[in-house]
Amino acid sequence: CLWNGFSKTPERDEQFNLSIPYMKNEQIILVKTDSDYQTLEDLAGKTIGVQADSSAESALEAEENKEFKDSLGEIVKIEDYAMAVLEIQNGTIDAISIDEVVARFYLNNDPDAYRILSDSDGNALSLATEDYVIGFRKSDNALKEKVEEALREMSSDGTMKTISEEWFGEDVTTVE
């Protein structure tokens, strides 16, 4: 099965037997804490990093984000988020378009180094919202059902919440 940051899309729904959503995710913008960037408009003419072939890249390419994308100076496609974080630390890029759950992992490990661009109410500025699911072969109904049963048990006994809070600083799970 495919599990790591696997977003639900219509194309994947046709190709795979998808599980129930287990996590909600947003595509957000991560900047260095000491940067002057407060809004998407502040990034006009700046360089933003994005993991190649990711949901973050798709969000930047989406029609609803065209104005923001067109305002940027450059979009740099980076191999993975770990490299993108190094690039922002080094000042090679000004910001990262990134999965919120991945950003929260970095924030949880180094809370003074980064921040998420937020609106005036403190909510993360989101380029897109998505559900994380697990992709199984179309024929793997039995395995899918067992995994979903385990997810529901972990949700009901609080295990998912505990793990989520440990790694992301908050409960981002959606299984009921």
Model regions: which residues?
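Extended ligand-binding regions for polar small-molecule ligands
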Residues: Y37, G45-T47, A52-S55, T129-D171
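Solvent-exposed loop/turn segments at secondary-structure junctions
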Residues: S7-E11, D34-Y37, G49, D53-S58, ...
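Acidic, polar ligand-binding/catalytic clefts
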Residues: C1-D42, A124-L127
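Short helices/loops that flank or line small-molecule/ion binding pockets
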Residues: C1, Q15-N17, E41-A44, V76-F105, ...
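Periplasmic-binding protein-like
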Residues: M23-V31, D110-E149, F168-E176
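Ligand-binding cleft/hinge of the Venus flytrap
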Residues: A56-E79, V85, L107-D112
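A ligand-binding cleft/hinge motif common to bilobed small-molecule-binding domains
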Residues: G5-Q15, A59-E63, D94-A128
